[in-house]
Amino acid sequence: MATTFLRNLFSQAQPSLLRRPLMPSSSSILPAAARLFSSTPAQNATLNQVMRGCRKPQRARHAVSPALSSIKSPALKGVCVKVGITRPKKPNSGERKTARVRLSTGKVITAYIPGEGHNISQHSVVLVRGGRAQDCPGVRYHLVRGALDLAGVATRMSSRSKYGTKKPKKASVG
């Protein structure tokens, strides 16, 4: 089996593999336009590397927000099952407001409530988007402020669009 593989490998149109120069010439340093920004020449896998299985495809990354990415939806509606707090991971301290939400697909997830203060309670209808809370374990979703039953942050002046706050009215002079 291995001898047949080796015979086919070297007998076809690859005699240059046996007579490869020790140092690459200046013409072989940039073999393709795809390698223009690389500082080293492209190297093919050796026979031992191929036999070990180096040409397996890379595994796909896991989804950050699997309940949304599995149905390819940017946001989903859900009903709050429980509202509570979560303690953040080690270097941080505080209380992060979270909610357990039953999505319209039937899955129950934990979502972070952004901003200061909120008005949701059990049975509130909320809109859930992807994106994890980096210092809260198991929290892979955010609630959208200013959508459905979750009101925007009332006193917010900067980054208002992220917190569902309307532009404040200008005070009229006179």
UniProtKB/Swiss-Prot annotation:
CDD domains: Ribosomal_S12
An individual GO BP term: translation
Family classification: Belongs to the universal ribosomal protein uS12 family.
Role this protein plays: Component of the mitochondrial ribosome (mitoribosome), a dedicated translation machinery responsible for the synthesis of mitochondrial genome-encoded proteins, including at least some of the essential transmembrane subunits of the mitochondrial respiratory chain. The mitoribosomes are attached to the mitochondrial inner membrane and translation products are cotranslationally integrated into the membrane.
Subcellular location: Mitochondrion
GO function terms (MF aspect): structural constituent of ribosome
Keywords: Mitochondrion, Ribonucleoprotein, Ribosomal protein
Keyword Coiled coil (UniProt): no
Broad class of the protein's primary localization: mitochondrion
GO annotations of cellular component type: mitochondrial small ribosomal subunit; ribosome
Organism whose genome encodes this protein: Neurospora crassa (strain ATCC 24698 / 74-OR23-1A / CBS 708.71 / DSM 1257 / FGSC 987)
Taxonomic lineage of the native organism: Eukaryota, Fungi, Dikarya, Ascomycota, Pezizomycotina
Cysteines paired by S-S bonds: none
Ribosomal protein is among the record's keywords: yes
Protein name: Small ribosomal subunit protein uS12m
Top-level taxon of the source organism: Eukaryota
Record's signal peptide: none
Subunit relationships: Component of the mitochondrial small ribosomal subunit (mt-SSU). Mature N.crassa 74S mitochondrial ribosomes consist of a small (37S) and a large (54S) subunit. The 37S small subunit contains a 16S ribosomal RNA (16S mt-rRNA) and 32 different proteins. The 54S large subunit contains a 23S rRNA (23S mt-rRNA) and 42 different proteins. uS12m forms part of the decoding center of the mt-SSU.
